[in-house]
């Protein structure tokens, strides 16, 4: 019996609409489930149609190759959250589709500390959990308690932060992104402490100002490469003489060399060519192999 779909499917969807790079090919089907039941139904439909299924966040570190993806790409959009107070501490349960920075701001305004480092962090909670997002002295691994997951497109489970095996910008979830129907993060439960709303808000405003000053203008997916141990990817790329190098409409930023900017109509191939160039030059000159922080489909 065919699976009834409670979620809208968008055929031949240009994924440039869903990537901060504003570049990339099409997905055969694109969907935005907003509940676990919708995600389960979508996974069942994809299995029935014998189509590969990939879960994504908000596309802030995503590039789909120009030839596109012959399957289903889905972005989970549930955004509910619930705060459970325990005197001077609290736990907040946040669905994966909620914006990381916006949620952190709301909690700070309520006097809850723990996520203020996420000010200006692009993307949603789910992607942050998968990639152990971090900046300005904080990271997901330090405050996450548990994650609610959908495994094999059918089984809802809860994993502890230890189960996720976090390292720098890595998790076991990230390693499983390309295996069968990959795990989907449905929600995360985070640890908070009571703080002064004015002080927390002031800190977040300072972080936002610093981030704005350091972030190149234009369409990008943020840091392209992870920082190697004891060094910075941007410094190495700059030292290799690649600042400002352009292929098509893709450019290695003159402000921060670990950013690749779409200056107009860049193709995924242009961005990938700059990625390969940076990797090759840095490896040749410094003997360091840069590892991607962005996700290529």
Curated annotation (Swiss-Prot):
E.C. no: 1.3.1.98
Keyword Flavoprotein: yes
Membrane-traversing stretches: none
Gene3D superfamilies to which the protein is assigned, alphabetical: 3.30.465.10, UDP-N-acetylenolpyruvoylglucosamine reductase, C-terminal domain, Uridine Diphospho-n-acetylenolpyruvylglucosamine Reductase, domain 2
Assigned keywords, A-Z: Cell cycle, Cell division, Cell shape, Cell wall biogenesis/degradation, Cytoplasm, FAD, Flavoprotein, NADP, Oxidoreductase, Peptidoglycan synthesis
GO BP annotation list: cell division; cell wall organization; peptidoglycan biosynthetic process; regulation of cell shape
Location, primary (coarse class): cytoplasm
Catalytic activity: UDP-N-acetyl-alpha-D-muramate + NADP(+) = UDP-N-acetyl-3-O-(1-carboxyvinyl)-alpha-D-glucosamine + NADPH + H(+)
Active site: 169, 223 (proton donor), 293
UniProt-annotated location(s): Cytoplasm
GO molecular-function term, one example from the UniProt record: flavin adenine dinucleotide binding
A Pfam family that the UniProt record links to this protein: MurB_C
Every FAD-binding PCMH-type domain range: 22-195
Domain of life of the organism encoding this protein: Bacteria
Entry cofactors: FAD
PANTHER family reported for this sequence: UDP-N-ACETYLENOLPYRUVOYLGLUCOSAMINE REDUCTASE (PTHR21071:SF4)
HAMAP family linked to this entry: MurB (MF_00037)
Role according to the record: Cell wall formation.
Family (UniProt): Belongs to the MurB family.
Protein known as: UDP-N-acetylenolpyruvoylglucosamine reductase
UniProt source species: Chloroflexus aurantiacus (strain ATCC 29366 / DSM 635 / J-10-fl)
Lineage, highest ranks first: Bacteria, Bacillati, Chloroflexota, Chloroflexia, Chloroflexales
Protein encoded by which gene: murB
């Amino acid at each position: 019996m065919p699976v009834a779909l409670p979620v809208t499917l968008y055929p031949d969807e240009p994924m440039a609409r869903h990537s901060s790079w504003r570049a990339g090919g099409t997905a055969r089907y694109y969907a935005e489930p907003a509940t676990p039941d919708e995600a389960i139904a979508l996974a069942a439909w994809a299995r029935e149609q014998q189509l590969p299924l990939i879960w994504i966040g908000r596309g802030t570190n995503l590039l789909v190759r120009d030839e596109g993806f012959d399957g289903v790409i889905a972005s989970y959009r549930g955004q509910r959250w619930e705060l459970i107070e325990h005197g001077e501490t609290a736990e907040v349960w946040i669905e994966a589709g909620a914006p990381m920075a916006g949620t952190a701001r709301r909690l700070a305004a309520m006097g809850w500390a723990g996520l203020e480092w996420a000010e200006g962090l692009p993307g949603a909670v789910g992607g942050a959990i998968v990639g152990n997002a971090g900046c300005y002295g904080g990271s997901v691994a330090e405050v996450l308690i548990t994650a609610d997951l959908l495994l094999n497109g059918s089984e809802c489970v809860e994993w502890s932060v230890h189960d996720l095996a976090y390292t720098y910008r890595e998790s076991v979830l990230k390693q499983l992104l390309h295996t069968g129907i990959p795990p989907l993060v449905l929600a995360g439960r985070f640890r908070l402490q009571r703080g002064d709303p004015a002080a927390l808000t002031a800190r977040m405003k300072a972080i936002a100002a610093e981030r704005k000053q350091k972030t190149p203008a234009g369409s990008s997916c943020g840091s392209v490469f992870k920082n190697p141990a004891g060094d910075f990817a941007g410094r190495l790329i700059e030292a290799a003489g690649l600042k400002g190098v352009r292929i098509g409409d893709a450019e290695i930023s003159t402000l921060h060399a670990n950013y690749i900017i779409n200056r107009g109509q860049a193709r995924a191939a242009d961005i990938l060519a700059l990625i390969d160039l940076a990797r090759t030059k840095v490896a040749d000159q410094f003997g360091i192999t840069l590892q991607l922080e962005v996700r290529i489909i």
